[in-house]
Amino acid sequence: MSRPDLIIILTDEERAAPSYENHEIRAWRNEHLPARAWFADNGVSFERHYVASTACVPSRPSLLTGQYPEVHGVTQTDGLGKLHDDTRMRWLRPGEVPTIGNWFRAAGYDTHYDGKWHVSHADLMKNGKPVPTNSGDGHVFPEAVQAYLDADPLGEFGFSGWVGPEP
């Protein structure tokens, strides 16, 4: 028997559909989110789950390491009040706590990460600012994308293919 392919999808700011959800909203979701319906029909959904932290940044390393924020050390969220390089902001350090990327890679899986990371500061920097990979209006900067792929900033966390910068 061959081992299964796995796709893990993490999203921000969602909740389970409430029991009182009306028919119109359910119909809209089914019509406009067909890929989500496909994954729900063909995958595994966890109906009773809890986050390790109400803040998104500490929750991500908890999901990826299986450890509480007090163990992996990421307990705060960066933003306007605290930037990535603030001495009060602690990120997960490579090799400190293994992630599911490390475990799956060790088991022979090809591990890829796409989207918001917010587990460590992974942006490539130039002149003190993150290297942009697009102009914001849809124009992609291929050389910047390649720079992220070549740098492989999530490699030590067990993932490849990530292209920044963080939103």
Question: Where in this protein do the model-derived segments appear?
Answer:
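Formylglycine-dependent sulfatase
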Residues: 1-167
